[in-house]
């Protein structure tokens, strides 16, 4: 029960409710984008360092409204799924925002997947439109698509008819070349149909915060990946509260984590949106040298990464000796830091503070987090304090709450708990109790 380290040892039961100070917010992704663009119009929202692209919040809003309008013109309707099968780049970010603005559900798909894994994901959630890159490392995405959807070569763009993938109607590729049966992503970033754009603006009040916004696939360590459905309410609130603890407001974030993962979305993408921070994508996939150069060139103040990423970052910095002067905070999750790694993060990367986050896909992302004033012992040996407005308990095999300090299964209840696993009622019932306690296993 090391996550309960802050609770008084006088507590008899390992149940805790973190009441919190700030209120929960009832907003959609689109409403949050509109609000941030209004409050910080000229602040940079996202910089894709490796692509040489950058957008302010006002320009993101403008482009996203047009992209959302074009999604609807393709025949997509509220609740339809838009798959994103791509590495970290600008079109990933814009697609997620555009889907949210149009009342659609974005689906992050691991860019390293091969044809069978991609096919499983597309079928599992019934993806209607797929946005993808041209290539990533050794991956040639059009060739992968041809294997599972051979009709693409002879289809009219936006009107795909696939026997194997009957739900898939549109493939959109971020490419300069025109590929048979596919739309070009850049063509969807402009829309001369002002009525269509106005329709997107008008529909914002009809999209509820409780409606699905994003689907995350679990890692699938015990079978096929499950499709975790997250709402706008899940995402905006989890991002707001983890961003607040990370002091994200006005920061410039170096984001090394993959965007298809819950960490990349909640702790980075929407946290930056909620707090008016700038997000920097150093490379399409993790590259320590690109990260270091982006940190220096873009004056990043916060670095996000897993412990293994920090190990590689430190090794490369010892070699390059770049002048890291602006970075102050390192945020890590996925595994505990060793004392040696914590010391090197501070000494070699010249950071003042290191923070731990702990969570899981079914909980939107983060549910425990260390505080800015935590000492080294808490950073190394705990995952910090429970998030505001959440409940936690530890239970035994019979479902009884164990005494404080005793081992057992962690359960969480509150705003960040997923809606359900899509098309998987049995697994949902296994994981979510009738009282909405999520069993972490």
What spans do the regions from the language model cover?
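Conserved AMP-binding/adenylation subdomain of ANL enzymes
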Residues: 235-252, 260-302, 312, 316
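N-lobe entry segment of adenylate-forming
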Residues: 1-74, 78, 123, 147, ...
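Conserved adenylate-forming
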Residues: 74-76, 192, 196-211, 215-256, ...
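Gly/Ser/Thr-rich phosphate-binding loop
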Residues: 186-190, 277, 300-305, 314-378, ...
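Structural core segment of the AMP-binding/adenylate-forming
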Residues: 1-2, 104-190
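Conserved ATP-binding/catalytic segment of the ANL
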Residues: 74, 85, 400-405, 409-441
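Flexible, low-complexity linker/hinge segments
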Residues: 18-27, 179-212
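Conserved AMP-binding/adenylate-forming core of the ANL superfamily
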Residues: 25, 45-97, 114-119, 186-193, ...
């Amino acid at each position: 029960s090391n996550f309960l380290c802050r609770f008084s040892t006088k507590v008899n039961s390992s149940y805790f409710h973190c009441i919190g100070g700030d209120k929960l917010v009832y907003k959609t992704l689109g409403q949050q984008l509109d609000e941030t663009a209004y409050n910080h119009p000229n602040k940079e929202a996202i910089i894709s360092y490796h692509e040489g692209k950058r957008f302010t919040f006002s320009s993101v809003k403008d482009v996203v409204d047009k992209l959302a309008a074009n999604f609807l013109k393709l025949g997509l309707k509220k609740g339809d799924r838009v798959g994103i099968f791509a590495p970290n780049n600008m079109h990933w970010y814009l697609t997620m925002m555009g889907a949210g603005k149009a009342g659609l559900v974005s689906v992050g798909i691991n860019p390293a997947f091969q044809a069978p894994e991609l096919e499983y994901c597309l079928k599992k959630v019934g993806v209607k439109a797929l946005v993808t890159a041209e290539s990533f490392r050794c991956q040639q995405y059009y060739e992968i698509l041809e294997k599972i959807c051979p009709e693409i070569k002879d289809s009219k763009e936006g009107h795909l008819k696939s026997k194997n993938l009957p739900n898939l109607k549109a493939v959109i590729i971020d490419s300069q070349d025109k590929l048979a049966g596919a739309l070009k992503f850049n063509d969807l970033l402009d829309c001369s149909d002002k009525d269509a754009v106005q329709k997107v603006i008008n529909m914002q009040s009809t999209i509820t915060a409780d409606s699905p916004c994003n689907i995350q696939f679990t890692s699938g360590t015990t079978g096929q990946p499950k499709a975790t459905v997250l709402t706008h309410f899940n995402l905006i609130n989890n991002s707001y509260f983890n961003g607040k603890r990370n002091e994200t407001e006005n920061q410039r974030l170096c984001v090394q984590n993959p965007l298809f993962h819950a960490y990349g979305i909640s702790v980075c993408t929407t946290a930056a949106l909620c707090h008016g921070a700038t997000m920097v994508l150093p490379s399409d996939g993790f590259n320590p040298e690109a990260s270091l150069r982006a940190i220096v060139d873009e004056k990043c103040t916060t670095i996000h990464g897993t412990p293994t990423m920090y190990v590689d970052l430190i090794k490369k910095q010892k070699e390059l000796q770049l002048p890291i002067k602006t970075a102050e905070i390192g945020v890590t999750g996925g595994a505990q830091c060793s004392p040696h790694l914590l010391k090197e993060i501070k000494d070699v990367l010249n950071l003042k503070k290191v923070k731990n986050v702990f969570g899981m896909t079914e909980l939107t992302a983060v549910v425990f987090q260390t505080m800015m004033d935590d000492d080294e012992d808490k950073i190394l040996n705990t995952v910090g304090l429970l998030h505001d407005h959440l409940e936690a308990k530890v239970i035994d095999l019979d479902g009884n709450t164990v005494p404080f300090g005793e081992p057992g299964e962690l359960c969480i209840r509150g705003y960040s708990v997923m809606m359900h696993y899509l098309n998987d009622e049995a697994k949902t019932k296994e994981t979510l109790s009738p009282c909405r306690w999520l069993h972490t296993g």
